[in-house]
Amino acid sequence: MLLIVLCAACNDPYDGDTFVVFDTQPAATYLSSRSEDFSEWIHIMKYADLYNAVNQATQRFTLFVPNNTAVQEFYTRRGVSSIEELGTEYARNLVSYHIIQDTINQATFIEKEGALAKRTVSDDVLMVSFGSAENGGGGMRSVYLNSEAHVLEFANPVSNGYVYVLGNTLT
């Protein structure tokens, strides 16, 4: 009799409800949600075996991600049609050059021209520069990394850091 009473008294008021733990996704999942923009870079990250590495919940990252057009232009400059022609080691170095294992928010990123305080996973320094008004620049539309990669989007938040979108691939 007691068992019947206990079973009847167990009603879950949240039964059937869906709960979201995070309203943002980890870095690689975010890129996949925008595959129309980043499918080429996702392919490079997977080929380099670094795609899942930037999905870790216990680590913080800042990713500088070239869009598909930027990756295609990079291939053209290198005289190849895919990352496989350059090899796995090259791909790992390339992806590592585009990742900082720490967070850099937008305010810190644009704070001053010059070297970012944190180094990339490949232990390189990235330099922030601002285009001049005389060259059609000025403001947020004229921010570059290493004077070669135009920053198109700043500090898109992900659950484990930030994603910056580049109009050029860092080399």
Protein language model regions, located:
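Aromatic/histidine-rich interaction motifs
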Residues: 76-150
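Envelope-exposed proteins and targeting segments
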Residues: 59-62, 124-126, 141, 152-154, ...
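Bacterial Sec-dependent N-terminal signal peptides
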Residues: 6-33
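Sec-dependent signal peptide recognition
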Residues: 1-3
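FKBP-type peptidyl-prolyl cis-trans isomerase
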Residues: 64-74, 156-171
